[in-house]
Design a protein with these regions (language model features):
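Short, catalytically relevant binding-site loops at active-site mouths
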Residues: 111-113, 134-137, 188
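SAM cofactor-binding core of SAM-dependent methyltransferases
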Residues: 3-107, 134-137, 224-228
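Conserved beta-strand signature within the Rossmann-like core of class I S-adenosyl-L-methionine
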Residues: 125-134
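Short glycine-/acidic-enriched loop or helix-start segments at secondary-structure transitions
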Residues: 41-42, 66, 115-118, 139-140, ...
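Rossmann-like AdoMet/SAM-dependent catalytic core
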Residues: 1-24, 31, 39, 93, ...
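Short, structured coil segments at secondary-structure junctions
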Residues: 49-50, 123-124, 176
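A short, conserved alpha-helix within the catalytic core of class I
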Residues: 111-123
Length: 264
């Protein structure tokens, strides 16, 4: 267990530090999309420990004023970009704000993450962290539709229908020249390594036997219609959103279907 939480939401700080040591990567330059005010994020630990170049992106009011006060901002080269990212602007935003080789790319916007990754060039970074939705389980190969301005709590009141399934994410990342090495303990952030770092050399001890090991999460963050927590667990989470429409990506399709149609 290498998970250590310093500034990350869970144990991503420890995982990243371990991966950089394993890959023998000296630079720690990063791009992170979906950072909020940056107090709890996947790359803040890297920034404050190693002072690399970085780009953080989110769409919150007074973002710079909220981020700068608690950082030793002068110690590293951090660009703060206030932008609502979608599949149409992602490449332009990266090209305009990132003038360095990316060592770690992190994406977590609880939204159309699949469609944003789909637009990225292959092998954009050495390490890639992407959030997935464990509620979709291990077998479904789905994502929410590519809706402009997608909001998780608006698409379904339960807050459970967002993002993509782990299986869909892994297949997409394989097309982008990465391989999957596992997730955090909470089972919502997947870690991928560029094929430039051969699995046989760096992670020959890792064997992915079943995706169930990365989707059976005990997180209970579901909401009632009045926005109070409903604490759904197990199969009840997927049952709650069975009427929601998702894109079925199985067999290279992109069919818009209700989740319940995929469960029958």
């Amino acid at each position: 267990d290498v998970e250590v939480k310093v500034f990350s939401q869970n144990g991503e700080d420890g995982i990243l530090d371990c991966l950089f040591n394993k890959l023998k990567v000296d630079s720690k330059n990063f791009v992170e999309i979906g950072v909020g005010d940056y107090r709890e994020s996947n790359t803040r630990f890297l920034y404050q420990k190693y002072h690399p170049k970085g780009l953080i992106i989110d769409y919150i009011d007074d973002m710079e004023k909220k981020v700068k006060p608690f950082l030793n901002f002068w110690k590293g080269d951090l660009t703060i970009c206030k932008k609502k990212i979608d599949s149409k602007n992602i490449l332009d935003v990266i090209n305009k704000n990132c003038n360095f080789e990316i060592d770690v790319f992190s994406l977590d916007i609880d939204s159309i993450d699949y469609w944003i990754i789909d637009e990225l060039k292959p092998n954009i970074s050495k390490i890639f962290i992407a959030e997935y939705n464990h509620v979709f389980g291990s077998e479904l190969e789905v994502t929410v539709p590519n809706i402009s301005g997608f909001e998780r709590n608006s698409y379904h009141y339960s807050n459970l229908c967002y993002g993509m399934s782990l299986k869909a994410l892994i297949k997409l990342m394989e097309k982008k020249d990465y391989y999957f090495i596992g997730s955090n303990v909470q089972k919502n952030n997947a870690f991928f390594i560029s094929n430039d770092f051969k699995k046989e050399k760096f992670f020959n001890n890792i064997e992915i036997k079943s995706l169930d090991n990365y989707t059976n999460s005990n997180i209970r963050e579901s909401l009632n219609k009045d926005s109070s927590l409903s604490y759904l667990s197990g199969d009840k989470k997927l049952k709650e959103i069975e009427e929601c429409k998702v894109i079925n990506l199985k067999d290279n399709k992109k069919d818009l279907v209700k989740i319940k149609e995929l469960l029958s």
